[in-house]
């Protein structure tokens, strides 16, 4: 069994009573409690605090509460001591997930993905991280004799940055620990510590009012369109559904539009190039309308026409184009309905990729889906690209 511990003391230097400050009409701690309660891997959620107000709010959210002694709620109190105190009362769990409430953009999906990495390995700990600038590896330190040494390796200061290893920083969002090993060695860095990589947006930590405003704006991300195209059977519906699920956790104004369903709504009558093009124009118009009304639209459609790409780029202000690429040989193997085999035999007409030519877009992001392996990784990578793209100006 797994327990989540959320530490939430009353004191704060940057923002007064930070854990209860309102972020889009909800207390800051709400987002971490929500993520923990919605997680599939967590069986118990505990809030540890010295504040009666915080504990009262946590209790109203149907989670366990633990009054923390004042000596464990000081500016210099370390997180390991807070966790040790909590585990004195909750020893009958195998693993603990430590979730700081200052990471409101960390969702239950992040937690579950991190726990999956942890459980599918021999790790006794996991720390969520974000990639950081590796130029620190080119720095020097001075030893007690006054001699310069490379901070990590004497070769690194003289290596091209492209050849330096990647560097990561803990983002404070997720810590997973074997309780047995943590009690034996009270440290978040254990003998076998894995990492869970999060993008810079999801890693944002609330430390001051500027951080709060930035996250507030991100949670209110204005309307945009993620246009996901590809041939029938390429996997665009599966990928778009996975992307929608991840975006919906953070941005409630997200909707998923599937081309097949939209054709029913628009009373689509045929599959010739002209009829497909007309249908695609209607879909584009709908996406544009929704985006202008602050809706995040994920649209999965074949619509592989240069006219549509140009239309979208010229009429949709916040537009991100994705192409799911898959070779015809693989599409034929996946062809359970016999669409491609029938078209190649001349039994079926108006099939895009066979007798209807299509244009591969010069998309913002191309997914090679020639293999169905690593689908979750492909969706995660797409999610990161989309989120960073639409928040780059914030």
Swiss-Prot record:
The keyword Methyltransferase does not apply. Pathway: Capsule biogenesis; capsule polysaccharide biosynthesis. Keywords: Capsule biogenesis/degradation, Nucleotidyltransferase, Transferase. Its EC number is 2.7.7.43. It comes from the Bacteria. Nucleotidyltransferase involved in the biosynthesis of capsular polysaccharides. Catalyzes the condensation of N-acetylneuraminate (Neu5Ac) and CTP to form CMP-N-acetyl-neuraminate (CMP-Neu5Ac). Belongs to the CMP-NeuNAc synthase family. This is N-acylneuraminate cytidylyltransferase. It comes from Campylobacter jejuni subsp. jejuni serotype O:6 (strain 81116 / NCTC 11828).
